[in-house]
Amino acid sequence: MEMVNIKINGMPLSVPAGSTILEAARYAGINIPTLCWMKDLNEIGACRICVVEVVRAKTLVTACVYPVNEGMEIYTNSPRVMKARKMTLELMLSTHDKKCLSCVRSENCELQKLCRDYGVEDVDAFEGENPQSPLDETTLHMAVSYTHLRAHETELHL
């Protein structure tokens, strides 16, 4: 198996060619958060929580889909990355239905955990309801299910 040499947060690593940045980081025990990623099923980089900084890249890249290259230098927690993840979480919450206290996943929710980790502390984000949301719970569930179904169909070439 061909290997490539990279650095993640200054740590030199040798990882299989063709690996994604996320796979390389996990191999090294480095956590990169994800919300939408599911190995071999949903690798589309849609949520953008897994963004990382690659030296000489013009923009942040999604670690779950971006392949490693020989000599690549990656930073998973630079100020730029942390700011982008926080902004992404804030945008997600701006359209969130905010029924977290009555949700079956309350306190076992990756979104809540990430908001705490990244200092998104808007108390209203986890209480009450979003009166501006045009979607009721049934419509929202259908929309999420449809989005996941379409992603899976694309991955499975159905």
Predicted region positions:
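Eukaryote-biased recognition of intrinsically disordered, low-complexity regulatory segments
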Residues: 2-9
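A generic secondary-structure micro-motif detector
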Residues: 11-12, 101
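N-terminal cofactor/phosphate-binding cores enriched in small/glycine residues
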Residues: 13, 17-62, 66-70
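Fe-S ferredoxin-like electron-transfer domains
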Residues: 48-52, 57-150
